[in-house]
Curated annotation (Swiss-Prot):
It catalyses: tRNA(Cys) + L-cysteine + ATP = L-cysteinyl-tRNA(Cys) + AMP + diphosphate. Disulfide bonds: none annotated. GO terms for cellular component: cytosol. SMART domains: DALR_2 (SM00840). This is Cysteine--tRNA ligase. Monomer. A motif ('KMSKS' region) lies at residues 267-271. Binds 1 zinc ion per subunit. One of its GO terms (molecular function) is ATP binding. Its EC number is 6.1.1.16. NCBIfam families: cysS (TIGR00435).
Length: 467
């Protein structure tokens, strides 16, 4: 039996993870609508579920990871009209930008990245099957899902039909039978991109796309379906209704949702002018700092984005990289074996066990990072020993590399620009002036790990790059 426990939105409790097939995991993550660059809220979902995939692979599971692109949609059509470009041209540009952004953030590509426009036939067949079973109906070229016919509607978002009915409205121009019904196929409007179908020219509704593509690439029932908390209702609720009405089987065994991201304690929105695009931020900071920041809070909890918290994340990542760099520098000056190798190797085994225990508990990356800080602390303690062993140093390095890789974090030391070095020296001088010697020493160690040598003189601090 697996020791991994995860929180299932469907049941609102932590459950032991038992995939449908032993050692195989089928995972579907809702991807972006590609009409613009992704924002840092999208980035949180990408980073969180990439990390969960990495951890499952680390624990020996064979993961098939599917994440879609919505490459036709109202937003894309509007963007095409505003920019005077075609929908496919805009989609292609932002799919390319998406791959650049997530690669910078340390996310691996999905095994399959299906696009809606490449799966129109599959979607049409799915809709026709729902019509044949009485779960959908056509009105003047539009096709709607008959929501009340599906008994389990509301089970994911834990809402009753009566509660949902109270807030439902029929928009002007809609001809559906019930305010709760939603569109599976939208009849074409003049000048819009469209495809031929049994109901005339049109395009798919948003919700049906994921149901059809998840089934095509992963089968009737998948292990994990994941996405942002904002997708729970109506998107994921509607996916369940569509898929389970068609197959009569559970659509997904486990539903995972990451929490919201706020900016300086306010919801991120274009109207507030606090909308942060990944494309912009990764040109200002090390993208790995953004990833570290996202993983420093449990994935289900809300996270607050601010300059101060980003700086704290930068310091945290630097602390780990510095400890790793110090170990590397000691390699040539160590002996083959020492008397206390066994004790240190035992400590390392305990650290790995702690990391696994924390990550097994609903992928708690925040506590996983705390374990990495303990690893850094033990590394620094070890380097204070009179004699060190290459055997133990290599074991420390391996733990750093493997556990950091699970979190998608790199240990590569970026070469500092001259201005960055000068800024750190000014920060160190300020710390010394304020008698914060711990901070001053930490900055000096950070620079030393990046091969920057400081010399304090009566005229001020000088620096040079080591050979």
């Amino acid at each position: 039996m697996s020791s991994i426990r995860l929180y299932n939105t469907l049941t609102r409790k932590k459950e032991t993870f038992e995939p449908l097939e032993p050692n195989k995991v089928k995972m579907y993550v809702c991807g972006p609508t590609v009409y613009n660059y992704i924002h840092i809220g999208n980035a949180r979902a990408a980073i969180v579920f990439d990390t969960i995939r990495r951890y499952l692979e680390f624990r020996g599971y064979d993961v098939t990871y599917v994440s879609n692109f919505t490459d036709v949609d109202d937003k894309l059509i509007r963007a095409a009209r505003e920019l005077g470009e075609s929908v496919p041209a805009i989609a292609e540009r932002f799919i390319e930008a998406y791959f650049e952004d997530i690669e910078a953030l340390g996310c691996k590509k999905a095994d399959i990245h299906p696009r809606v426009t490449e799966n129109i036939e599959t979607i049409i067949e799915f809709i026709q099957a729902l019509i044949d079973k009485g779960y959908a109906y056509e009105v003047d070229g539009d096709v709607y899902y008959r929501t009340r016919k599906f008994d389990g509607y509301g089970k994911l978002s834990h809402q009753s039909i009566d509660e949902l009915q109270a807030g439902a409205r029929i928009e002007v121009g809609e001809k559906k039978d019930d305010p709760l019904d939603f569109a599976l196929w939208k009849a074409a409007k003049e000048g819009e991109i469209s495809w031929d179908s049994p109901w005339g020219k049109g395009r798919p509704g948003w919700h049906i796309e994921c149901s059809a593509m998840a089934r095509k690439y992963l089968g009737d029932t998948i292990d994990i379906h994941a996405g942002g908390q904002d997708l729970t209702f109506p998107h994921h609720e509607n996916e369940i209704a569509q898929s389970e009405a068609l197959t009569g089987k559970p659509f997904a065994k486990y539903w995972l949702h990451n929490g919201y991201l706020n900016i300086n304690n306010e919801k991120m929105s274009k109207s507030l002018g606090n909308f942060v695009l990944v494309h912009d931020i990764i040109r200002q900071i090390d993208p790995q700092v953004l990833r570290f920041f996202m993983l420093s809070v449990h994935y289900r909890h809300p996270i607050n984005y601010s300059e101060e918290l980003l700086e704290s994340a930068r310091r945290g990542l630097e602390r780990l990289r510095t400890a790793y760099g110090n170990l590397q520098h000691r390699l040539g000056a160590s002996t083959n074996l020492t008397d206390n190798d066994g004790e240190w190797l035992s400590r390392l085994a305990d650290i790995r066990a702690s990391f696994i225990r924390e990550m097994d508990d609903d992928f708690n990356t925040a506590n996983g990072i705390a374990v990495l800080f303990e690893l850094a602390k033990q590394a620094n303690l070890y380097l204070q020993e009179k004699t060190t062993s290459e055997n133990v140093i290599h074991a420390f390095l391996r733990e750093f590399e493997q556990l950091m890789d699970v979190l998608g974090l790199t240990l590569k030391q970026e070469e500092l620009l001259d201005e960055e070095i000068e800024a750190l020296i000014r920060q160190r001088n300020e710390a010394r002036k304020n008698r914060d010697f711990a901070l001053a020493d930490r900055i000096r160690d950070e620079l030393k790990a990046k091969n920057i040598i400081l010399e304090d003189t009566p005229q001020g601090t000088r620096w040079k790059r080591g050979s």
